[in-house]
Design a protein with these regions (language model features):
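Flexible, polar/acidic helix-loop-strand segments at domain edges
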Residues: 90-102, 351-431
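Short, surface-exposed recognition loops and adjoining beta-strand edges that mediate ligand/DNA contacts
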Residues: 32, 60-82, 174, 204-223, ...
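Conserved, well-structured interaction surfaces
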Residues: 34, 38-47, 51-61, 85-165, ...
Length: 538
């Protein structure tokens, strides 16, 4: 059905740079046998890295699983929450603390995210070492291209590490010793990522990574261009090494060297978004088609996690985690009755008014639930009716504790899914052109230009009236267009709203300094490496 490179897994990594990679697991094939020609070197030193983009393990994968990057970028924001439902979803206060920004350095899930990200970074360094030591078996072009792709993957994971933890170590050698690992400032990590991507982009294939074939699921030049646009858009944040003093550089005064020209952050973002347009990306006429069971031919999706329940173990948990038990049962499986959109989110979509956004029914399950045109009934004999406006962080005393909250939609239901709907055929969308248009609109407005063409192209696609291209409308449109796609935390930080009060969340003491915009360095890592210093106010 789907064509994707299969490979031999690379070895797992050291924790927080505390020990070396285990190069000799019992089931590992002879090193020379698996690196004895160019095809095997690519499969086992380059393609193997893509095993780590998705996952079926908690806190691993860029999206799809729970208690990881996606949850910290979504369930810490005004977009969504996992409310306590009587005896369900307390989990030691995990979800409530996440929503209230009450995490700390001993949070095991943050530690697991750090461990996951640096696992892939270290394995990438190992891959670069393997390519270099076997270059006698490769042509100069193969050596260049393999190296470029691995560096791009490594830059991708450094991007997520920097975005979450700010000051992280830059390690580019596989055989580095613990005492050599030092912490870099966030601005240094930012510059490293930008330099790496700009350096390798010309060597990356220009293919559309979301389409089936030899480049399916890989980091190609358009993926790098999207990431460079995202880095430029957030340059004010990422170049700020003292994020608790309330000051940051204006993007107009942050400069990049782009194709030999000096451009400010906003001009840089616009330039990379324009490259995506030139590379053939465009909006799909049908918004929902980007999230269909078979979405590999989308003209809009740029970078996806390939899912195929018959080939891969990668999972997509968010429909399963959100739907009521009976709702999942109607599809022949189960569900966990958890994640919901906040009241402010559904109100942003116009729920409860005569002007509901046309994307609402695609993105959410709300009101009376129908499956195959039939109502679903609860154990008490009443039909299942989700109540979007009855949501509270703690529903233990609510008559709506089982049904409060609009539930996760967006992705078409795969009626042949495995594992209670977690193993599906819908590829998980990480980057898409609709986001790039909104980035371009925002960059233009911040640069004193008119972003209305890009902003209203998004609204035209879903049959919504035009709005003025100002920052407030752009932030709202990003919620309407990108809900459930994992961008809300970054957006709120960039717009200065992440530490503000919102739905049933009161800011923490001293949170006005912005200290929660960066997560704490895990205590286990600080204990292992005394050269690492904690982020401010943790």
């Amino acid at each position: 059905m789907k064509t994707f490179i299969k490979y031999i897994l690379a070895a797992p990594l050291m924790l927080c740079f505390s020990s070396c990679l285990d190069e000799h697991p019992k089931d590992q094939l002879d090193q020379e046998a698996i690196y004895n020609n160019a095809d095997n070197i690519y499969k086992n030193a380059v393609a193997s890295l893509y095993n780590y983009i998705g996952s079926n393990q908690e806190s691993e994968g860029l999206q799809g699983t729970c208690r990881g990057i996606y949850d910290y970028n979504t369930l810490t924001t005004d977009e969504a929450m996992n409310p306590i439902r009587g005896g369900d979803w307390y989990d030691g206060g995990l979800w409530e603390n996440m929503y209230q920004h009450k995490w700390n350095a001993n949070d095991i899930n943050l530690y697991n995210v750090w461990k996951y990200l640096f696992k892939v970074i270290v394995i990438s360094n190992q891959s670069l070492s393997i390519i270099d030591s076997h270059k006698s078996l490769l042509s100069a072009e193969q050596t260049r291209d393999f190296t470029a792709e691995v560096r791009a993957v490594r830059a991708l994971f450094y991007y997520y590490a920097m975005d979450m933890f700010g000051r992280v170590p830059i390690v580019t050698s596989y055989d580095v010793k613990l005492e050599q690992v030092t912490q870099s400032e966030r601005s240094e990590v930012f510059k490293f990522i930008v330099d790496e991507l700009q350096d390798v982009a010309p060597q990356l294939a220009d293919e559309h990574s979301n389409k089936e074939g030899d480049y399916y699921g890989r980091v190609t030049r358009p993926v790098a261009n999207f990431l460079l646009a995202k880095l430029a858009l957030n340059a004010e944040i990422y170049t700020d090494d003292n994020w608790t003093n309330g000051k940051r550089q204006d993007g107009k005064n942050i400069y990049f060297n782009v194709n030999g020209e000096k451009k400010n952050a906003w001009e840089t973002c616009i330039w990379y978004c324009e490259q995506l347009r030139q590379e053939g990306y465009e909006l799909e006429s049908d918004y929902a088609s980007n999230f269909a069971v078979h979405n590999e031919n989308s003209k809009e999706n740029i970078f996806t996690i390939p899912l195929d329940k018959n080939l891969y173990l990668n999972e997509y948990h968010y429909l399963f985690r959100s739907r009521h038990y009976k709702h999942g049962g109607a599809y022949g499986g189960s569900s966990e009755n958890g994640t919901c959109a906040t009241v402010s989110t559904v109100k942003a979509f116009g729920y409860g008014t005569d002007h509901v956004d046309n994307r609402f029914k695609i993105n959410f399950y709300a009101d009376t639930v129908l499956v195959d045109g039939k109502k679903i009934y609860l154990d008490n004999g009443k039909p299942l009716v989700y109540m979007p406006l009855e949501l509270k962080l703690n529903l233990s005393d609510s008559p709506y504790k089982q049904t409060a909250g609009a539930r996760v939609g967006k992705y078409e239901v795969d009626r042949t899914a495995y594992s209670d709907g977690r193993q599906v055929d819908n590829d998980i969308v990480l980057f898409r052109y609709g986001d790039a248009l909104l980035m371009e609109a925002e960059a233009k407005v911040r640069n004193g230009e008119d972003g209305s063409i890009e902003l209203n192209a998004i609204r035209d696609r879903v049959g919504m009236p035009h709005v003025e291209a100002n920052l407030d409308n752009i932030l709202k449109e990003r919620l309407l267009e990108l809900v459930w796609e994992g961008w809300r935390r970054q957006d709120l930080i960039r717009f200065g709203k992440y530490t503000k009060a919102y739905d049933q969340r009161t800011p923490l003491e001293k949170e006005s300094t912005g200290f929660t915009t960066v997560f704490p360095i895990p205590q286990r890592c600080l204990d292992l490496n005394k050269k690492l210093k904690q982020n401010p106010s943790y």
